[in-house]
Amino acid sequence: MTKFLTKLTKLEQEINHPAVKRQVEEIALIDSYVQAGKPLKRAPRRLGLLPDEFEEVLVEVGPDKEGALRDLNNLLNNFRQYLSLIYGIWSLPNIQTAQLIKNKLHVQTALEIMAGNAYWSQALAQVGIKVHSTDSLEWAKTSTTGAKPFYPVEDLPADQAIKKYHTVNLVLCSWSPNFGHGDLETVAAWHKYNPSCHLLFVGEKDGATNSPEFWHQNWFKNSAALDEINHSLQSFDFINEKVVEIKNEF
C-alpha cells in the first residue's frame, strides 16, 4: 500500500484518458489534505469506474489497455483501505459537512467517542465547535497509524466519556465496528447521561459499520437538517456512508 500512489500514477499515464486522470488527481488532492492533517473542503467526488463507464473508457483507449484499466480501477475502489492502512482513518470528513452540523443542529460543543485518529474532531473544531475527542486507544497500541492523531485524543472509553462530558450539544461516533455491541452501549450511556443532546453516527447501514442489532432498532430520526447534512457527505466509493441520528425519545 505504500506504493499505492506511485502505481496509480503510472497506470494513469499508461492509460492516458481524461476520466481516469480526473480521478487520480482527486486522490492526489485528498492524500495531500490528509497528509497535512487538514479536513477536505468538500466531500470527494465519486471514485472508481462503474461497469458502463469502464466499457466506455476501454472503447476509447483500446483493448490492449484492458489489464491496466482493471488494475487502476481496483486501486480506485480500494482507496478507503489505503487511507485506513496509511493514516488510520476510514471516513473522510469535510468542512462543508462540519459547518452544516454546527449550523443546522445548533452545536457549540461536541464529544467524539471511539475517535481513533480524530479526523472528525479536527473538522468540527475548524468550524468553531469546542470538541472533546476520546478513545480507549486499545487499537493504537498495536498499530503505527495510531501514533499521529489529527486532534488531541483523551484515553477514555465511550461510556465514561459520555458521563464526563455530559453537557455537550453533540455526541459523534464515526465508523463504530460492525462487531460487538459498542454502539448499543453508547446509546445506553447517552440515554442515561445526556439524552437531550444530538447523537450522531457516521457509517453504513447493514454494512461496513455498527452491529446488526443497532440497525434493526426503531430509533432513527428523520429531518430536513439531516437530509441536508447527508447531501454534503455523498460517499466516494461503493460504501454507502451516511450520518444517522438517534431519536431523543424511543
Task: Show the residue positions of the predicted features.
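N-terminal accessory regions of S-adenosyl-L-methionine
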Residues: 1-92, 237-239
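Conserved class I S-adenosyl-L-methionine
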Residues: 106-116
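Gly/Ser/Thr-rich loops at beta-strand to alpha-helix junctions
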Residues: 114-120, 179-180
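Conserved SAM-binding loop of SAM-dependent methyltransferases across substrates and taxa
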Residues: 117-129
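A short SAM/SAH-binding and catalytic strip from SAM-dependent methyltransferases
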Residues: 168-182
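C-terminal substrate-binding/active-site "lid" region of AdoMet-derived donor-dependent transferases
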Residues: 181-250
